């Protein structure tokens, strides 16, 4: 009697086959193995002509995730480079828009300079606090962060201040010296330019000290500006609160204000100082210190 053909074999009614397969899912492969072992030893598998489906096993998923993982890893440095580029552009915009405002007096450039500064200060804040959940601890740290304080500074004059070059000076000075440090290494091939920029950069400490002085004296400018409609009470009040915040958390601001306080004390102690001024100065200092 001839051996049964593989394709026509009655698999369903073979009790040994059912026991052989058990719970396996590769039915066709097991059929071929069983047929060759128990029915026709000369049977040759036709798997080499059968197209297999792509595996959806866990190993395949693992491989897929492992190939996407480096992409996710690479995305972060790319995003960091994007942020750095945005920070540089923002710093440049502060410089250019301040110069444009100085030349033209157009308030449009004044507000653009403030927006550029806001972006420039916001990027380091994002880098510092990225991924943090909003809570009281985060709010407390933001208040102490100098970049966050400068964002507050920009917002004060964007919403409450009239356009004035003096309000842009601190941001301009900080941005200018930031960019100077970036540009100098690229001027090595031109010694004259490099030496010139390095000389300018050597004035960094004096320039920053001047920016701090402007930042402090703005409160006086805003106060006296009330009488010429250049300023308003709300601006003076908000900026004074900002300055108290800076005094609390910035050592440079605190040192400069203390320096001014000593100068006022020396002037009030001078014999030529009018008595009423000498008497009113301690009262003013008491009110300001509250």
Swiss-Prot record:
**TM annotation in the entry:** 83-103, 109-129, 150-170, 218-238
Q: Which GO terms describe its biological process?
A: endoplasmic reticulum tubular network organization; membrane organization
What are the GO cellular component annotations?
endoplasmic reticulum; membrane
Q: Which cysteines are joined by disulfide bonds?
A: none
Instruction: Give the superkingdom in one word.
Output: Eukaryota
List, as start-end ranges, the regions of compositional bias called Low complexity.
45-72
UniProtKB keywords: Membrane, Transmembrane, Transmembrane helix
- Give a yes or no for keyword Membrane in this entry: yes
One Pfam entry for this protein is TMEM33_Pom33
UniProt xrefs under InterPro entries: PER33/POM33_regulator, TMEM33/Pom33
Region Disordered, residue ranges: 1-22, 39-72
Intracellular or extracellular location(s): Membrane
The protein's topology relative to the membrane is: Multi-pass membrane protein
Similarity annotation: Belongs to the PER33/POM33 family.
**Name of the molecule in the record:** Transmembrane protein 33 homolog
What is the originating organism of this protein? Dictyostelium discoideum (Social amoeba)
């Amino acid at each position: 009697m001839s051996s049964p053909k593989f394709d026509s074999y009655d698999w369903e009614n073979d009790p040994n086959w059912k026991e052989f397969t058990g719970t396996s899912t590769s039915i066709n492969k097991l059929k071929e193995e069983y047929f060759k072992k128990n029915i026709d030893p000369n049977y040759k598998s036709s798997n080499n002509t059968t197209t297999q489906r792509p595996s959806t096993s866990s190993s395949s998923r693992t491989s897929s995730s492992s190939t996407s993982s480096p992409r996710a890893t690479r995305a972060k440095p790319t995003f960091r480079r994007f942020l750095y580029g945005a920070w540089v552009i923002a710093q440049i915009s502060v410089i250019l828009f301040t110069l444009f405002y100085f030349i033209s007096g157009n308030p449009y450039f004044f507000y653009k300079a403030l927006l550029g500064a806001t972006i420039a200060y916001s990027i380091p804040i994002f880098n510092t606090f990225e991924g943090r959940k909003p809570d009281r601890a985060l709010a407390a740290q933001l208040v102490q962060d100098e970049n966050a304080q400068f964002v507050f500074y920009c917002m004060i004059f964007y919403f409450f201040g009239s356009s004035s070059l003096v309000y842009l000076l601190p941001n301009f000075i900080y941005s200018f010296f930031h960019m100077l440090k970036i540009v100098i290494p690229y001027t090595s091939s031109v010694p004259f330019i490099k030496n010139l920029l390095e000389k300018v950069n050597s004035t960094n400490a004096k320039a920053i000290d001047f920016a701090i002085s402007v930042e402090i004296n703005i409160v006086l400018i805003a106060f006296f500006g009330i009488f010429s409609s250049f300023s308003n009470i709300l601006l003076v009040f908000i900026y004074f609160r900002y300055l108290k915040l800076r005094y609390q958390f910035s050592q440079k601001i605190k040192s400069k204000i203390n320096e001014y306080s000593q100068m006022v004390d020396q002037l009030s102690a001078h014999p030529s100082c009018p008595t009423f001024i000498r008497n009113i100065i301690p009262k003013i200092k008491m009110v300001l210190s509250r």
